[in-house]
Regions:
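Outer-membrane beta-barrel proteins
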Residues: 43, 74-78, 105, 117, ...
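Outer membrane beta-barrel
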Residues: 46-70, 75-187, 191, 215-218, ...
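Transmembrane beta-strands of outer-membrane beta-barrel proteins
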Residues: 51-59, 99, 127-129, 175-177, ...
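Solvent-exposed loop segments that connect transmembrane elements
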Residues: 67-76, 186-212, 247-249, 281-304, ...
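Membrane-embedded beta-strands of outer-membrane beta-barrel proteins
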Residues: 86-88, 115, 164-166, 219-221, ...
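Detector for outer-membrane/organellar transmembrane beta-barrel domains
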Residues: 214, 223, 228-341, 349, ...
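Predominantly the C-terminal beta-signal and adjacent terminal strand-loop region
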Residues: 359-399, 403-405
Length: 406
């Protein structure tokens, strides 16, 4: 339903969406950091070498109050509690060689989440080859909640792809670059893979739904200003250029995107802001629209604007507590809006107000998810199906996601 991955990837994000898995947000990164320290102690004390195993089991409770068939069914039943995700992961190191792999099972589908091999040239420079998270904009996530932000639904949050990436840390300056030749690996069908992106619909009836991301180059630079021991501000710039392959005509278009972001940590407060602009220029035959592209994720397909601006603003507050196993509460409000460039009257918005609860190995999201013309939040789609479907109504989903990490 979004600061880079280290060589030890014990806790990764879980996918958002209607009826499919949720995501692990910024608080969950803290769990990952703690796991990494524990794993380092368990590894060879002299070299840090070793192999570590982990996983997670998650369940989801949801009450859908949207104006949709799913919303009506949810109201009739008083809500639903369902299996969300089971995953296993392994990562490790042998001298300068590192690796990580993760596989996930959802309800009726499963696929590879992560699978890469890396090499540490120095303590500050690493390369990785394989399926991995793409560094673009706010990292590792552009939201705090279970449902992600609008960036996720247009393919720019928690994005994974297959390619070669380089990370370099020069004091307060972090530089990431990579070339990603293919979308994430899937087992069956064009859209059965982790991570959202432009992809073909296996059941398409026209070439508007035939495009696929290929040979994408990403670059990101971020600088952190340390104000004092408990306050810092990161500012960053990201860019992307890539190809859009038409599986029907075998012609190629192109894609460009850039993002400016600020991520501030001020004692217990965290503020994230980002402006992202992207332009997909697909090559289509006469008579077919180039204003809309098909997005694919975990077997789901939906329409998204070919060109849009995405604005994100999030505020979060951490409250340490001592209440049984509960050690921290994170309160947050995440807001994002997607504005289609080709028309002024089509926009989408997502606002999530919630709380993340840390209790030992259990991590819980309690969210009020409100969407306007957002996929998986109501019946009206993505404000792209024609003027009659563009509505200003906000739809609401109440969601609780509970996960046990081991």
């Amino acid at each position: 339903m979004m600061r880079k991955l280290t060589c030890y990837c014990s806790v990764a994000a879980l996918v958002a969406g209607a009826g499919f898995a949720g995501n692990a947000m910024a608080d969950e990164q803290r769990i990952a950091d703690l796991e990494e320290r524990l794993e380092a102690l368990e590894a060879d004390p002299a070299t840090g070498d070793g192999i570590r195993f982990g996983g997670a089991l998650r369940f989801n409770a949801r009450y859908d109050d949207t104006d949709s068939a799913g919303g009506q069914a949810s109201r009739d039943s008083g809500g639903d509690i369902d299996f969300d995700t089971f995953r296993v992961n392994v990562d490790g190191r042998q001298d300068n060689i590192t690796f990580a792999a993760e596989y996930r099972w959802y309800d009726g589908r499963d696929f590879l989440h992560t699978g890469w091999v890396g090499y540490d040239f120095t303590d500050t420079t690493t390369v990785r080859l394989g399926q991995q998270r793409v560094a673009f904009g706010l990292q590792p996530y552009q939201s705090n909640n279970f449902w992600f932000s609008g960036n996720y639904y247009v393919g720019f949050e928690d994005k994974h792809a297959i390619g070669l990436a380089l990370d370099h840390q020069a004091g307060p300056l972090a530089i990431d670059a990579g070339i990603f030749t293919n979308p994430p690996a899937g087992l069956s069908g064009d859209s059965f893979h982790y991570s959202t992106g432009v992809g073909p619909d296996s059941d398409r009836e026209d070439e508007t739904l035939a495009h696929e991301e290929q040979n994408q180059f990403y670059a990101r630079a971020a600088y952190t200003f340390d104000h004092n021991e408990s306050a810092s501000t990161e500012v960053g710039l990201s860019g992307m250029y890539g190809e859009l392959y038409n599986n029907d005509t075998r012609d190629e278009g192109d894609s460009t995107a850039y993002a400016l972001h600020v991520n501030g940590q001020y004692d217990r407060w965290n503020i994230m802001a980002q402006y992202l602009s992207y332009d997909h220029d697909p090559d289509v035959s006469d008579g077919f629209s180039d204003d809309v592209l098909n997005m694919s994720i975990e077997g789901f397909n939906y329409a998204a604007p070919a060109e849009a601006d995405v604005i994100t603003f999030n505020v979060a507050y951490d409250l340490p507590v001592e209440f049984g196993p509960v050690s921290n509460l994170r309160f947050y409000n995440d807001y994002s809006t997607i504005r289609q460039k080709s028309t002024d009257d089509r926009s989408s918005a997502l606002n999530v107000t919630g709380m993340a609860i840390t209790a030992g190995n259990i991590y819980t999201y309690v969210d009020v998810i409100r969407g306007k013309n957002m996929p998986f939040v109501g019946a009206q789609g993505y404000a792209l199906q024609g003027d009659s479907d563009v509505r200003d109504d906000w739809e609401t989903i109440f969601n609780i996601n509970v996960g046990y990490y081991f």
